Every structure is written in structure tokens, then in C-alpha cells.
Design a protein with these regions (language model features):
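Glycine-rich phosphate-binding loop of ATP-grasp-fold ATP-dependent ligases
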Residues: 14-18, 38-65, 90-91, 113-133
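Phosphate-binding site of ATP-dependent enzymes
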Residues: 63-119, 174-188, 196
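Peripheral (often C-terminal) accessory segments that flank ATP-dependent C-N-forming ligase machineries
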Residues: 209-275
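C-terminal catalytic subdomain
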Residues: 185-217
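A long amphipathic alpha-helix within ATP-dependent nucleotide-binding catalytic cores
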Residues: 75-77, 82, 103, 114-183, ...
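Conserved N-proximal alpha/beta basic substrate-recognition cap immediately N-terminal to
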Residues: 1-29, 46
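ATP-grasp fold ATP-binding core
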Residues: 8, 31-54, 69-86, 171, ...
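Phosphate-interacting basic helix/loop segments used at nucleotide- and nucleic-acid interfaces
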Residues: 17-26, 31-34, 152-164
Length: 275
């Protein structure tokens, strides 16, 4: 993540990798001069929103004079960036083969208020079921930035080529509202050069009944129903119901589950798992 910020800062926005408490405070004060009052602090290597804190400027100042562990420094330090009032998280799934990059689809990401990943929603039409103002903003201002020939996509391809990377790649992004309430867009908050949960959701959705959507989520194993939920098929493909994707043992804490429905509102309820 630290290297991504350095290489793709034009698209990822203001953020900085820090390797000491004083460095962190300096970065926060610099962001505060730009009008930011809250910040997100995160580890360079973390998954599903782990290792993330939301802090005020007063809380960041408490790091003055403090050091960081050798492990954190070896990872690239702690990353600090402005905290946004996010209203829609999503990911863009690409495939890089040779010198070609191709967009495969967009996935809505479900993120808890604390930044914890809860699940991915994949529907044939990405903007279906969204508020009209958000859908219009997406179609007119946002989605064109991820087209195969867009500047961001070309920058992403160059970034991957410089690192000799080929294969699946997911970009996390989001919409937020600024202090005036206007919609804003962060083109990229993280680049994941691997098979992501969003990519898995996209591939699964292509195997269910036409016109239907999929929710891929992580749930507590203890909350799973004692009996499998009934499923309905349409022309041999899953059209409704849910399926657990991994084997559940007495020692299982979490499970990966898919839910299928034709209407997005049928899939928008989530439990927040805890340790």
C-alpha cells in the first residue's frame, strides 16, 4: 500500500507513508492545513479492513515522539490519509495479459462503519437499485474513468508492467460526500494484484440464473442455520436461496456464503462478524 501511494498518488489522493510518530504527526498537520480534521491510519499489509483506525487530529498528536516497531517499518510504515464520509464502496475487476488490460466488471463492496469488509454484491447492472443521484453521478462522472482506454486504466497497466505483473487485479474505490454534501469520488484507495473476493463474486454471478445477483459474504459459523436454506433453480441455475462454500467443522469460526436473488434489496442485510 505504501508503494502504491507513491506510484499512483494522482489517483489515490492525499496520503502518506510514515515511519515514526513524529513523521505521522507532521503528515497529519499537513493534511489539517488542507482542511481535514479526521484521518485514517492503517497498516501497509492488512486484509478485510483489519489494522485500520479512525483518529482525530488530537489523537494523532499523541504519537509525537513515539517510535514504530521494526516489523511496521519493514512493511513501509503506517499510512495516514484523510477520513471520508463514504456512501458507496466498490471495486473494479481487471485482467492483465501481456501488455493488455481489460475490465471485467464492477462489484459493490459492503463495508462496516469501522472499515471491516462484510461482503460483495454482484449484479448484471451495477447501478441498479441505487439512488438516482448516485446512479447518475456514477454513469456520468465515475464509470468512464475505468474504461479500458481511460487514463487511470493506462496508469494501472503501466504500474503492473513495471512490476512484471500479469493476472487478475482488483481496484478498491468509493464515493463520499464532502463538507458541503456534494458527491466526490476517490478513484482508487487500494490496488489488489490477485484474485479478490470481488472477483470471486463476479465469477459466481456468471454461473447463476440470468438477470440474478449474488452476495458473497463472510459470516460467523455459529450463526449459520442448522439446516441448509432451501434453494430454487431456474433452468438448472441457482435463482434464490443461499449456499455455504466451505466445509464447516466444530472448530470453524467463519464461513463464506453466497446468497442469490433477483432484487438487490433482498441481499442488502448483513451481520457484522466479531472475533
Amino acid at each position: 500500500k505504501a508503494l502504491q501511494i507513491q506510484a499512483l498518488q494522482r489517483w489515490m489522493g492525499p496520503g502518506r507513508s510514515t515511519t515514526s510518530g513524529d513523521d505521522l504527526v507532521e503528515a497529519a498537520l499537513s493534511l489539517a492545513k488542507q482542511g481535514w480534521t479526521e484521518f485514517v491510519l492503517k497498516r501497509p499489509f492488512s486484509t478485510a479492513g483489519g489494522g485500520m483506525k479512525r483518529l482525530t487530529i488530537e489523537e494523532v498528536l499523541q504519537y509525537r515522539g513515539k517510535g514504530m516497531s521494526e516489523k511496521i517499518i519493514s512493511e513501509g510504515g503506517l499510512i495516514i490519509e484523510p477520513a471520508h464520509d463514504r456512501i458507496l464502496d466498490f471495486s473494479i475487476q481487471y485482467l492483465i495479459e501481456g501488455k493488455e488490460i481489460r475490465q471485467l466488471g464492477l462489484i459493490e463492496q459492503i463495508i462496516s462503519p469501522s472499515g471491516q469488509y462484510l461482503g460483495s454484491l454482484s449484479f448484471p447492472k451495477f447501478c441498479s437499485g441505487m439512488n438516482p443521484d448516485i446512479a447518475q453521478f456514477l454513469m456520468e462522472k465515475v464509470l468512464p474513468q475505468y474504461a479500458n482506454n481511460a487514463r487511470f486504466t493506462e496508469s494501472l497497466r503501466n504500474w503492473a508492467e513495471e512490476r512484471n505483473f500479469e493476472g487478475p487485479l482488483g481496484v478498491d474505490a468509493y464515493l463520499y460526500r464532502d463538507s458541503s454534501g456534494s458527491l466526490q469520488h476517490r478513484t482508487a484507495c487500494e490496488v489488489n494484484p490477485r484474485f479478490t473476493m470481488g472477483r470471486v463474486a463476479l465469477d459466481i454471478r456468471r454461473q447463476v440464473a440470468p438477470g440474478h445477483g449474488v452476495c458473497l459474504e463472510i459470516v460467523k459459523a455459529a450463526k449459520l442455520p442448522q439446516r441448509d436454506e432451501s434453494v430454487q433453480l431456474l433452468d438448472g441455475r441457482l435463482a434464490s436461496g443461499s449456499l455455504v462454500l466451505n466445509e464447516i467443522t466444530p472448530h470453524s469460526h467463519f464461513a463464506a456464503r453466497i446468497r442469490v436473488a433477483k432484487q438487490k434489496r433482498s441481499l442488502e442485510s448483513f451481520d457484522i462478524p466479531t472475533k
